[in-house]
């Protein structure tokens, strides 16, 4: 692909990440997505009618209405002629949406694409099949957040057990995990206090009877986290295990996205892009150790870009669990000092369908801030997969 046909990031933005039943407790995912879409267009100076399509990842769509991506698009002010659709590759959805947007443009099917992800874990539904009725007795409800977002369909257990499996395979101790989690919290706290997330975040206004509330700060980050507090927690998924609530990612709400076009289109419009997408890849692994997915996915993405691990200046590797994040660091052998320099999902949170686009945002803005040349974003994916994307400064 020539430089002029390279796919670039014309703009990127995200909402703050909300805590479970926190600031965004009553806000549907599509409303979060709509705010991000409007901000993407505003930052790039692109008119709503100039967007060819909107592609948004979202995992938890039960009872959210038809096609939440279309709802986000229309609510953002895009014309009805602009199509929109959603995808579900679990935790990789937001980054996969960006990859598909890249492909749409590279294939000549679009000029301008909005891609990213949105998720409200707080509004995920409880449900059950009642078409045939219940003749007598109690009937158990299913938590769709757990069933559709956090449960391994092949082995019949929680994602936390897959993290326990990874910890055993890679010999990652409880101490290793707690130390990693504390570092994530400390880095995120420092980044938030220094204002390093401000360029990423678009403020979201929540209207209330007592006035408006502006949400423009990540809500989940724990200031003053201590190792002593973490070590007191009991294992969350296996009584003899090592994975706890403190060394696992959060349950969160949020949205994030990117506006994509070719470099030539950006030049024509007078837009200075944030970065160029160099390559992307996905890979499958055993579902029981799904957290290792970023290892083969990152290797494939690097190979497609013609890069080596040593070429990377920055990495955003999603922290589903400290155990799997440590395993990915070991498996790829990269310098941990360049990974998640502003903290990761353990501290910031993990709104599953949006997280891929969230870490993509954090990567491109931190690359710009540091003057970094080459970066990589990667996530593990429930069901046994990984996705990765290589990004290059222009």
How should each PLM-predicted stretch be described?
Residues 2-64, 68-76, 80-83, 162-174, ...:
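Conserved active-site "lid/cap" helical segment
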Residues 49-57, 83-88, 113-118, 176-183, ...:
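Beta-strand segments within the central parallel beta-sheet cores of soluble alpha/beta enzyme folds
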Residues 89-119, 167-196, 257-264, 329, ...:
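Active-site-proximal alpha-helical scaffold in enzymes
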Residues 8, 13-15, 25-35, 43, ...:
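N-terminal extracellular/periplasmic Venus flytrap/periplasmic-binding protein-like
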Residues 58-111, 154-158, 224-250, 331-358, ...:
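Conserved catalytic cysteine-centered active-site region
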Residues 263-311, 329:
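Glycine- and Gly-Pro-enriched alpha-helical subdomains that act as flexible
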Residues 112-165:
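Flexible glycine-/small-residue-enriched beta->alpha junction loops
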């Amino acid at each position: 692909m020539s430089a002029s046909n390279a796919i670039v990031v014309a703009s990127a933005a995200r909402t703050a990440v909300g805590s479970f039943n926190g600031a965004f407790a009553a806000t549907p995912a599509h409303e979060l997505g709509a705010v991000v879409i409007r901000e993407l267009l505003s930052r790039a100076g692109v008119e709503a009618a100039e967007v060819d399509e909107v592609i948004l990842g979202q995992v938890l769509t039960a009872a959210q209405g038809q096609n939440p991506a279309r709802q986000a698009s229309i609510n953002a002010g895009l014309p009805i002629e602009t199509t929109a659709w959603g995808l579900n590759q679990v935790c990789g959805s937001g980054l996969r949406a960006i990859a598909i947007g890249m492909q749409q443009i590279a294939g000549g099917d679009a000029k301008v694409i909005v891609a990213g992800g949105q998720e409200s874990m707080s509004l995920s539904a409880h449900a059950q099949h009642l078409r045939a009725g219940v003749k007598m007795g109690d009937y158990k409800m299913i938590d769709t957040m757990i069933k559709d977002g956090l449960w391994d369909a092949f082995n019949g257990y929680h994602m936390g057990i897959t993290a326990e499996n990874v910890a055993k395979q890679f010999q990652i101790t409880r101490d290793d995990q707690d130390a990693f989690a504390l570092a994530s919290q400390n880095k995120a706290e420092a980044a938030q206090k220094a204002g390093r997330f401000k360029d990423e975040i678009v403020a979201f206004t929540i209207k209330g009877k007592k006035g408006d509330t502006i949400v423009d700060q990540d809500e989940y980050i724990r200031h003053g986290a201590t190792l002593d507090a973490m070590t007191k927690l009991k294992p969350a998924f296996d009584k003899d295990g090592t994975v706890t609530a403190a060394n696992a990612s959060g349950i969160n709400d949020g949205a994030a996205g990117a506006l994509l076009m070719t470099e030539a289109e950006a030049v024509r419009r007078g837009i200075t892009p944030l970065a160029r997408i160099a390559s992307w890849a996905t890979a499958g692994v055993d579902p029981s150790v799904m957290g290792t997915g970023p290892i083969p996915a990152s290797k494939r993405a690097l190979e497609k870009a013609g890069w080596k691990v040593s070429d990377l200046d920055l990495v955003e590797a999603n922290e589903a669990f400290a155990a799997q994040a440590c395993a990915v660091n070991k498996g790829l052998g990269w310098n941990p000092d360049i990974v998640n320099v502003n903290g990761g999902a353990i501290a910031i949170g993990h709104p599953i369908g949006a997280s891929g686009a969230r870490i993509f945002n954090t990567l491109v803005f931190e690359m710009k801030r540091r003057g970094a040349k080459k970066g990589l974003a990667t996530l593990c994916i429930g069901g046994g997969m990984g996705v990765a994307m290589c990004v290059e400064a222009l």
